[in-house]
Amino acid sequence: MFQKDVLKGKRILVTGGGTGLGKEMAAEYASLGASVYICGRRQSVLDETVNEITENGGEIKGYACDIRVSEAVNDMIDTIWKDGGALTGLVNNAAGNFISPTKDVTPRGFEAISNIVFRGSFYLTHACGTRWIDEGVKGSVISILTTWIWNGGPFTVPSAMSKAGVNIMTKSLAAEWGHYGIRLNAIAPGPFPTKGAWERLSPGQDTDSNENDAKIPMRRN
């Protein structure tokens, strides 16, 4: 679909890049010639992904980082900048979620999700954006949303609220930073039957199940 090395010279950070959708995006970016960085909570998981993508010829590094902590985010971004210069792209993919009646959600449970999705996405976008503005870099941010921000997300209110915040951050900063040449976009790709996501959102359902196909009018996936 794309020319080989179409992303050569690009430097892209994918948060939550050790597993699932983040891993697949990181692998694709690397296959197209980008220098890729991934971050997540567990260095061991990141190392496995780094080794796998490197074996396939990709250029990638992984950093364990708690994106809920702004100081940790800034330290990681400084490290990446020193490693080879400014990033040209950021993918806000890291997220967390669980199924629960909202009446049972505790403040700690709410913060477990909102601190990753809402705060973490802002910390990363701000850390990259301020550096891009200072250095005159025309960077790009892609944030991953969910359809809950339009349709509502019963039993996933902390995530739905947080993703709605990321959506309005994207629109607001696109308007505010556009004149710097910084682009911000967001996509809601829908559910991917990865092990981690399905265990949290559809407990007991096989990732190979056709149950979700039945929700699609044309039965296509």
Predicted regions and their residues:
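Active-site helix of classical SDR
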Residues: T125, S162, T170
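Substrate-binding pocket helix/loop in short-chain dehydrogenase/reductase
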Residues: P101-T102, T106-S114, D208, N212-D213
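Alpha-helical segment proximal to the catalytic Tyr-Lys
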Residues: T130, A175-H179
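The beta1-alpha1 cofactor-binding region of Rossmann-like NAD(H)/NADP(H)-dependent oxidoreductases
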Residues: Y63-D75, P107
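Conserved glycine-rich cofactor-binding loop
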Residues: G16-G20
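Active-site loop-to-helix junction immediately N-terminal to the catalytic Tyr of the SDR YXXXK motif
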Residues: V105, G152-A160, S172, R200
